[in-house]
Structures are given as C-alpha cells and as structure tokens.
Amino acid sequence: MQKLFRTIPAIDKLMKKPQGIDLIERFGHQAFVQEARILIENAREQIIKQQCLPAFMNEQSSIFSLIEQNLQKKRMVSSKTVFNLTGTVLHTNLGRGLWSENAITAATNAMRNNVALEFDIDEGKRSHRDIYISQLIQQLTGAEAACIVNNNAAAVLLMLATFAQGKEVIVSRGELVEIGGAFRIPDIMAQAGCKLVEVGTTNRTHLRDYRNAINENTAFLMKVHTSNYHIQGFTKSVSEEELVELAKEFDLPVISDLGSGSLTDMAVLGLPAEPMVQQKVAAGVDLVSFSCDKLLGGPQAGIIVGKKALIDGLQSHPLKRVLRCDKVILSALEATLRHYLFPEKLTDEVPTFQLLTQSIETLQNKAERLKAVLNKRLDSRYILQVEPSLAQIGSGSLPTETLASVAVTVFAEKQSDLLELEKRFKALPSPIIGRFAQQKFWLDVRSAAQFEQLLNMLEEA
C-alpha cells in the first residue's frame, strides 16, 4: 500500500509540468490546485478501500485531462437550452416566451454599457428609473401613469401593501385564484397585512354582494382575472364597469389583477380573445396589473397602470425599491413595448406571436421534415406518424382554449422503449422536451422555436 501511495504525484510537481503550466494559465493557480487536491484525495481513498490506484493515475496525462474536464464543467452554466415540443407555447417550466431580437440587442447593450437609468441627461440630475418606459406605457394603454416591478405577483403585493394594510379588500369568491408555485391571492393578502373579504359564491357573484360588504374599513374593491381556469354553466359575475360605478358611490378605488395581460386584440391575429389592458383602463379601473413575460412577449416583469395619484403612492412605498427591475430588464421591456407601436408587425417581430400564428400548412411542413430526420435516427421499434394536435398558449393564458397544431407522434409496442427514447432526447446537447399522451410520445411543432437548429442537432446526433 505504501508503494501505491508513493506513486501519487505531488501538486507542486504537477504545476511544473507543461500541461500543468498550461492549465494554470487558462484557469488560474487557485482553481488548478483545488481540483488537483480533490483528485489526489480521491486516489488516496481508493488505495485505502480497494488497494489499487484509480484509472486516471495510471498515466500522468490522464490526471491533467481529468483536471481540465472538471474545470471546464465549472465554467458551464447549469441552465440548459432546450427545445420545447410540448405544444405549450408559453411553458412556465421552460422559461415561457422568447425575447425579440430588438429586446435581446437592448439588453445586451445595457449589459455592456452604462445607461441613463436614473439620470436626466437634459437636466443633468437624478431621475426615476421607470419614467421613460412609463411614458411609453401611457401611450399604449391610455393610463395616466405606470409603475414597473419584477413580476405580476410583486405588483399585486405592492398594491395591497400600499393601500390596504390593516384594511379590508373585497373579492369575489370565484376569483380567489391559485397559480403555479402555490401563489394564492389570500396568501398574498395576508403577507400584505390586509384582510380578505370574500363575497358571492364560487359560481355566482352579484353587485349587491359587493355593496353589502363595504364598510368604513374597506380599502378597495378588487377584480382578479381567472386566467388559468374558467367557470361555466350557471354563473354570474360583476364587470369592471359595474364595480367602478359602485365604488364611486363610496369614494373607493377599484383594482384589477389582469394576470397574463394583453396589449393587442388577439382576435385580430386569429387567436382566442383575451381581456386587454386598454379596456380595463377605459372602464375606469383605478389600478391594473399584468405580466410582461406571458402574452406581452417580453422579459419577466410586472406593470401597474392607472391613476397618477395612486401610482405615485406605489412609487414612494419602501417595497418598490425591493421589487424594482434592473437596467437589463428595463431595456428589454422598453424594446418589447416599442413593437406595440407597430401592431401590424407583431407577428413578424415578437417570437411569441410568430409561434402562435403559424398556419397549419407551415406546421404540417415542419412536422414532415422532423419526421424524416427522426426516421433516419430511430430503429424499427418506433413507428412515426404526423398527426393533428391541440396546442395551448400556456402560462395560465386562456386555459380552456386550444390551438390547432401538428405533431410527430412516436409509438412503440413496449412502453419501456418510449421511456428510453425520452431519455435519449433529454441526453442531447439541447434536450428535446415532448409529452406523453394516448400511449404515444408527442412532439408538437407549434411550440418549437429555433426549428432549423433542432433539425441540425438531430442530423448531427
């Protein structure tokens, strides 16, 4: 055993070898020594437990190769790019939508340079970081002012904490939503220090229910867009317009959590209709909050629009600093919003709309091409077909609506073969994520961004 221990090289000797000098030059002295120590310690442990040297100690070149390999792994980012073929275009677990080229350019420019984030160049003095985008949002929505935070949940929390702490907020029982990650409206209210007052029933809420619940401790009336579920049948709800008229009688504000939010008429694009921010503002709602990384097609952020006096209150609350966005997100968001100044070009420039508005003919062609490539790579255990599919927008947007789509389906007699195929897809340089349904593995091409890159990867695999 002592003889084996003597074969373990000293770290200082490894450092003086040409390979060691090269690795230190590339990765630094500290990182090289740390990795070498780990390997040497592993070698010692193996000698004690198994009375033999590990394979990498048989040749000195092997230990240098392993050190290099491990150091390279440390440089790799853990979040992998993937190909989304689930059929869910805005898949929350896969990062939702892609940014437009303009947004990417704006974000990259902000990363590489100083920007006038909170500085008025003309006046030569400090400014507010939301001001430039706020003016753009006002133009797009018709609102008096805007406030930007890091997501819509933060927007809801800020509104509640600013105006309802220690007070009551009235919400319809049918609108007490829970979204992914166990985000619940009642929990957010508790966190903000306000009391939830539920009115109506799960399926029916009347204007009188709100009226009967109003008292001297009421902070405001709240509407929550149930973006991830839909109640059908014997139902009744109260519109924003009705709530606004009621609130005026008691000098109370109305706030609306619009969730996914949309700044364009989806029906014009041939897609299912979704409530627009502009409509809520026009209805007289005092504050409207919505997400930026869902139907808007931008980075993760939350926007609150509404009456200037209320927005000023949000901007001055201590939580606003906690929840604010950085220069990169603000730059990408502004670039995304500027696309909406040219609505007829949205489907050409915003990836979310590019994917959602693809024709069936385009999808059929993509599916046939994908099938042809896969047929070359898969053996006779797998039967491939191009079939009609139903895709969805995702991220809690229009939960009951589906989009006609096309998919490549893979069938195998043995379920274990399909599981093996899924494992192979996940082991690719950029994993392919599909879905199981009807005893087949589905690869829905509507949600597949970077389609040519997908085919190239499969050709080379």
From Swiss-Prot:
Q: In which pathway does it act?
A: Aminoacyl-tRNA biosynthesis; selenocysteinyl-tRNA(Sec) biosynthesis; selenocysteinyl-tRNA(Sec) from L-seryl-tRNA(Sec) (bacterial route): step 1/1
**Source organism, top-level taxon:** Bacteria
Q: Extract one GO cellular component term from the record.
A: cytoplasm
Reaction equations catalysed? L-seryl-tRNA(Sec) + selenophosphate + H(+) = L-selenocysteinyl-tRNA(Sec) + phosphate
One annotated GO biological process: selenocysteine incorporation
Question: Which UniProt keywords are present, listed alphabetically?
Answer: Cytoplasm, Protein biosynthesis, Pyridoxal phosphate, Selenium, Transferase
- Places the protein is found: Cytoplasm
What SUPFAM superfamilies would the database entry show?
PLP-dependent transferases (SSF53383)
| UniProt similarity note | Belongs to the SelA family.
What does this chain do?
Converts seryl-tRNA(Sec) to selenocysteinyl-tRNA(Sec) required for selenoprotein biosynthesis.
Name of the protein in its database record: L-seryl-tRNA(Sec) selenium transferase
Source species of the chain: Actinobacillus pleuropneumoniae serotype 5b (strain L20)
Print the organism lineage: Bacteria, Pseudomonadati, Pseudomonadota, Gammaproteobacteria, Pasteurellales
